[in-house]
Amino acid sequence: MVTHGKKYQDAIKLLDQSVAYAPAEAIDLAKKMSAAKFDETVEMHLKMGLDPKNATQQLRGVAVLPHGLGKTVRVLVFAQGEAEKAAQVAGADVYGGDELIKKIEAGFLDFDVAISTPDMMSKVGKLGKVLGRRGLMPNPKSGTVVPAEDFKKVIEEARKGRVEFKLDRSGIVHIILGKASFEGQMLLENMTSVVDAIIRSKPTGAKGQYIKSAYLATTMGPGVRLDLRAVSAMGGV
């Protein structure tokens, strides 16, 4: 049985679990309930009306957070030849080909985003078990498999706060919005960008209610239920 400490118990007293809060109210409440000694991450969890086993109902995409994630993002690029030089010029923190792949196989994982040129993917593919489970595998659908001329744009987006979202096996999307230390308006604008991207990425096979429930929470805090009408209204901005 999971037990919670006094700080959590005090925090949850602020929450009325029978209420579905407007996004701005939910953010304010989540910030007030953030009682950890570190700067907690603020996350949103959406239960989608999608079947993860249905090929026509897969959801995957990218959102760029206008206020970033509140951390320094290290970008790695798999490239060789002229493309490797382009990665350096574009500002990648780590870049390379075969030797970089060997380095990762040996345990190197000091990066937050991985990008690859299309021609490198046949080699990068063997890192699937290492990178896939950490959400670091380059993927064309998430815009991280690109030609060298797109490196600068993708790297800049990653540093600004480029976040990927994907439907998990339970039909839920988990996505980071920023840090509890962010001002409420910053988190609200990040949330708006995320919801808009998710609505714009609605699969062609989706049927019925697209978003079934939405919750906001900090790393150590309780979940705050969001008003679905208000959340859905964020789409199409």
UniProtKB/Swiss-Prot annotation:
Subunit structure: Part of the 50S ribosomal subunit.
Gene name linked to the record: rplA
Entry similarity comment: Belongs to the universal ribosomal protein uL1 family.
CDD domains on file: Ribosomal_L1
One term of GO molecular function: rRNA binding
A cellular-component GO term for this protein: large ribosomal subunit
Provenance organism: Dehalococcoides mccartyi (strain CBDB1)
Designated name of the protein: Large ribosomal subunit protein uL1
UniProt record, GO biological process: regulation of translation; translation
Keywords on record: Repressor, Ribonucleoprotein, Ribosomal protein, RNA-binding, rRNA-binding, Translation regulation, tRNA-binding
InterPro entries: Ribosom_uL1_bac-type (IPR005878), Ribosomal_uL1 (IPR002143), Ribosomal_uL1-like (IPR023674), Ribosomal_uL1/biogenesis (IPR028364), Ribosomal_uL1_3-a/b-sand (IPR016095), Ribosomal_uL1_CS (IPR023673)
A Pfam cross-reference name: Ribosomal_L1
The protein's role, per its UniProt record: Binds directly to 23S rRNA. The L1 stalk is quite mobile in the ribosome, and is involved in E site tRNA release. Protein L1 is also a translational repressor protein, it controls the translation of the L11 operon by binding to its mRNA.
